């Protein structure tokens, strides 16, 4: 059975100018990779130049009984971009909001043990705050709609000290050993509220059921929670041309909460069996997953096939709704697909336990960037 060892995090993920590769838990203090010594071996370059090749991404995916959503923030030094997509699970109806954030030095913090990511634009307000030392996580968001889109307001909170709140940090080559990518994954049960306000009516969707008056109050069982979040922060050196594919899946199989993330790109390490960021959180345990191959032989809107060579992952993804954003300015070209759909198949944990997925909510992403 495939496995990778998970160890205690080092004091710094860069020591003596070299990255410390591996999988770590709990969370390290920072994801700062700027101190690498000569990450580009073509010629000696000052740090202020090589640091411009570092970009950061933050992604938060959430699942509730009625809705499935994902938020992605791109920190590209000279500009930041945020996109939130929300789908109604019963109908597949989509709400999409985008925001350019200019003249911000760094929207995604370097620290990971605690941090805050905010945007206070009038029509796009979001605040993401986490603190592992206090065991707190919160996400507040208010989005102003228009005649075709509802106003969206939601707030989530989670307990990072809960036994089902699991995290994993991977430091991997990108793709050579001189450069690295630092990726932090967190999965946790959520509580909070969610509301949609249309121009003609108000639809409120509570995430937690209130106890009847006079009933005894008790702590909910996190294993039976219906609301889950998957939080990812990635900081990496990028090529001038980069493309990647990913799949994030959340759901419950036979009463066991299942959450995992699969990722592959043209910056995968030369030895992906030894270093990769794929991870499964199931039954209160963390399982490093092997590298995968993601193909879509029937087109992006047809069935996707996700498999590995270790017989741990055998999945099919069926797209429901594709959100596309394309930009082309001089030599800059981007093409991002954020696809909501259903996932079916099987996945195994490190003990060989087989989980069968049926009608799981998932979001797949296919991204291309040329600078």
Go through each PLM region and give its residues.
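Structured soluble/peripheral alpha/beta segments that form catalytic or ligand/cofactor-binding pockets
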Residues: 1-371
């Amino acid at each position: 059975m495939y496995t990778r060892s998970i160890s205690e995090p080092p004091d710094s993920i860069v020591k003596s100018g070299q990255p410390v590769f591996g999988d770590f838990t709990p969370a390290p203090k920072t994801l700062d990779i700027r101190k690498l010594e000569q990450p580009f071996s073509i010629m000696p370059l000052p740090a202020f130049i090589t640091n411009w090749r570092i970009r950061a991404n933050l992604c938060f995916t959430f699942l509730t009984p009625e809705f499935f959503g994902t938020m992605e923030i791109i920190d590209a030094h000279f500009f930041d971009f945020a996109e939130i997509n929300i789908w109604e699970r019963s109908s597949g109806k989509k709400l999409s909001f985008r925001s350019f954030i200019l003249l911000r030095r760094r929207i995604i913090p370097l620290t990971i043990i605690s941090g805050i990511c905010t945007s206070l634009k009038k029509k796009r307000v979001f605040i993401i705050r986490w603190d592992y030392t206090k065991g707190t996580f919160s996400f507040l968001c208010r989005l102003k709609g228009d005649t075709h889109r509802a106003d969206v307001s939601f707030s989530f909170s989670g307990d990072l000290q809960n036994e089902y709140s699991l995290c994993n940090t991977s430091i991997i080559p990108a793709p050579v050993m001189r450069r690295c990518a630092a990726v932090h994954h967190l999965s946790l049960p959520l509580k909070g509220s969610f509301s949609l306000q249309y121009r003609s009516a108000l639809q409120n969707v509570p995430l937690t059921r209130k106890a009847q008056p006079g009933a005894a109050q008790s702590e909910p069982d996190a294993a039976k929670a219906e609301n889950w979040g998957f939080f990812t922060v990635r900081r990496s050196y990028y090529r001038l041309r980069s493309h990647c594919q990913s799949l994030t899946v959340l759901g419950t199989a036979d009463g066991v909460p299942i959450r995992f993330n699969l990722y592959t790109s043209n910056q995968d390490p030369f030895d992906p069996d030894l270093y990769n960021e794929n991870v499964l959180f199931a039954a209160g345990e963390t399982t490093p997953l092997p590298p995968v191959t993601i193909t879509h032989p029937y087109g992006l809107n047809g069935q996707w096939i996700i498999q590995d060579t270790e017989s741990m992952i055998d999945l099919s993804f069926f797209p429901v709704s594709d959100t596309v954003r394309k930009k082309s300015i001089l030599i800059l070209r981007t093409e991002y697909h954020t696809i909501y759909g259903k996932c079916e198949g099987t996945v195994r944990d490190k003990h060989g336990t087989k989980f069968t997925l049926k009608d799981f909510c998932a979001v797949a992403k296919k991204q291309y960037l040329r600078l």
